[in-house]
Amino acid sequence: MRNFITALPIVLLLGFSFVSFMFQFEHLVYFRLALGLFSLVGLYMIYKMKTGIRYFIIYLYASWIVLAAVTAFEEPIFSSFFFGGLVMTMGYLTYMLIYLGMKQDRDANPV
């Protein structure tokens, strides 16, 4: 059950980024591909890292900046799709930080 709870948000995020191609395919195409790839790489990094939280945080914020830049490149600023892309980017950042906190809590050595 714990693994299901851990995996559910990222599955929903990946599902949204890839399944959403069925709707409004001409908007945020590169953004959705980048979101899915950054999510997969971030998940892999979280599950494989033993130390090096600082590197993951650098990766996370760098990917957040790239996603925001891709959104600004693909959509006119202040359009509804632009704000939708920024909201999905913040969701990605939030999910990854939640996963990082869950990993830290799970891997902590009891005193």
UniProtKB/Swiss-Prot annotation:
<keyword id="KW-0812">Transmembrane</keyword>
<keyword id="KW-1133">Transmembrane helix</keyword>
<feature type="transmembrane region" description="Helical">
    <location>
        <begin position="80"/>
        <end position="102"/>
    </location>
</feature>
<feature type="transmembrane region" description="Helical">
    <location>
        <begin position="4"/>
        <end position="21"/>
    </location>
</feature>
<dbReference type="GO" id="GO:0005886">
    <property type="term" value="C:plasma membrane"/>
</dbReference>
<feature type="transmembrane region" description="Helical">
    <location>
        <begin position="28"/>
        <end position="47"/>
    </location>
</feature>
<feature type="transmembrane region" description="Helical">
    <location>
        <begin position="51"/>
        <end position="73"/>
    </location>
</feature>
<keyword id="KW-0472">Membrane</keyword>
<keyword id="KW-1003">Cell membrane</keyword>
<protein>
    <recommendedName>
        <fullName>Uncharacterized protein YdbL</fullName>
    </recommendedName>
</protein>
